């Protein structure tokens, strides 16, 4: 059986049920991350922002800080913390460069890279300024 045409790209690769479940898990994780960051005083500038270098899960702002946020949802805390590989960090750095090129008014802000870890039955964990390029 072919997946529906409106299904996310991940669902069209391999097993449709697994891809769709992963897509939904990602949406729920990003929603939890948005709620956490809003409670901490951040304003969401963009969600699932697509750039030529790749997708940025969240772009948030608080004061003069502009954060590119990667959301990682895993079954265990250690797996979530280790899920962001150096290759993905470089991709996010390139995507952030595209973001700043597309929206030059953000260039005056202090750019940083954050990670939000989502683990079942635990509070989401926000790692502000998780790495420096």
Curated annotation (Swiss-Prot):
Query: What range does the record give for the signal peptide?
Result: none
Q: Please give the Gene3D superfamilies that the UniProt record associates with this protein.
A: 3.40.1350.10
- Please, which domain of life does this record's source organism belong to? Bacteria
One Gene Ontology term of the molecular function aspect: nucleic acid binding
The protein's matches in Pfam families, at most eight in alphabetical order, are given as:
UPF0102
Query: Record's family?
Result: Belongs to the UPF0102 family.
Protein name listed in UniProt: UPF0102 protein Plav_3586
Q: Which organism is it from?
A: Parvibaculum lavamentivorans (strain DS-1 / DSM 13023 / NCIMB 13966)
Q: Which classification does the entry list for the species?
A: Bacteria, Pseudomonadati, Pseudomonadota, Alphaproteobacteria, Hyphomicrobiales
